[in-house]
Amino acid sequence: VAAGSRILFSRVGQVAANAAVVVLVAQQLGPAGQGHYSLTVAVTLLSASLLGGGMGLAAVPALRQGRVTPRRLMRAQALWMGLMSVVLGAAAWWAITDDAAASWLSLHLGWTPALAWLVAVGAFGMLGFEIFTYNLLARGRLVVGSAVNGWRALGHLLVVAALLLTGRLTPSTAVGAFAAAQLGGLVAIIVVACRDLRRPAQPINGMPGVPLAPCELPDDLDTRPLWKLAAFNPRHGALGQLSAVAYFLLLRLDQGLVEHFRGAAEVGIYSLAVYVGEMLWLLPGALTPLLVHSSAADASDPRRDRTAARAVRMGVGLTLVAALPLYLLAAPLLALAGGGQYEASVNALRALLPGIVAFAPGVVLAGDFIGRGKPHWNTQASVLTVVVNVAVALALIPRHGAVGAAWASSIAYACGSAVMLWRFRRTTGMSLRGLVLGRHRRPLPA
């Protein structure tokens, strides 16, 4: 409870800082500039997801079972990050020097040559932050990642505010502030992870003596050459990492479709609604790191499944409580982000909120599935959700624009969440009454 409260506190601060950044950028850049900014951030997210390689996901069972020392694992991860920095640098160089690529990026994303390097820096910071956050989660440091995220969001806000006050907030400097925030978060998490090497790993709180869920790992993992250890993680974490890629496509592919059919200004209108709505997921997301840790317990202990079900109920409750007033106050709140420029964002946000609430269980269960050693379940649900989203979006966006994209997302989110809840109930054998009401037929052992 204490860890969850601290994570939630950090997430609330992160939500507030992110909301302020969205408002400042949207006000200054206008719909077209906001659209280009949102699409550029999406490219950064996609690059980080593709190049993460499952290095963080694959580390969780290895660290939890003591098959590899944290110090050697970090060295292998640093080797991987070095290779990915070369890939990002080469991609940025190609985006600048290839005339066709530079022309396309300028037309659709509003890029200047310098932006390619900023995107590479931001993607490098994001993929490294994710890797080392999983290391800390595996060692029982449940709060650290959320705390650093909160400080990263605050730093991002301060930089954006300074740029605005000095009259220097442009699309390029907005992306630069975003990239600097990601790189700063990486530096902070590396410092924390290095300091953590001197501490013993923490046990599963509240579950003394509970064995870890079985996960097949080679016995010689810690004695392999560093390059083989670095190669092991992508082979065993790539499938789970596809979940991050699919999740990105779920959240941002529709913006690409909006740009294709309706232009960058419509993306700006839609992206503002998306940013505001998705901030609500930070609340149930506070429970995700707890489940990554607690759901690694053996299935023989019933507290594991009931803890996950309780987290689902809490996540839905938190999201619903925040979504109801946001639905009612959407018009005056979005007016703060640019007045009449973003009037159309109101209906898009209201169409998006039912899906935001419906997907809250999926946000929570993503951590549970990772803890069980089944991250590919997240991938399967995300892929299905993407397929539904694209199919409905292609039908609605050409005619209805941002509102059509929002309804397509809501329908897709509901489908994805339903699949994840079905998977959870099938795996645990939990009744619907137990999941929804917390009333179970069998009492917990004394």
What are these model-predicted stretches?
Residues 1-56, 85, 235-264, 413:
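Signature of the first transmembrane helix
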Residues 3-14, 18, 40, 49-101, ...:
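Membrane-water interface segments that mark the loop-to-transmembrane alpha-helix transition
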Residues 41-49, 247, 270-289, 319-322, ...:
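Transmembrane helix-bundle signature of multi-pass secondary active exporters and lipid flippases
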Residues 51-68, 138, 273, 277-302, ...:
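Helix-loop junctions and terminal segments of transmembrane helices
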Residues 65, 125-149, 354-381:
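Membrane-interface junctions at transmembrane-helix termini in multi-pass inner-membrane proteins
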Residues 97-119, 264-265, 327-360:
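Interfacial segments at transmembrane-helix termini and the short loops linking adjacent helices
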Residues 113, 117, 146-198, 384, ...:
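Hydrophobic alpha-helical transmembrane segments
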Residues 167, 171-178, 188-251, 299-303, ...:
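Interhelical loop/hinge segments that connect adjacent transmembrane helices in multipass membrane
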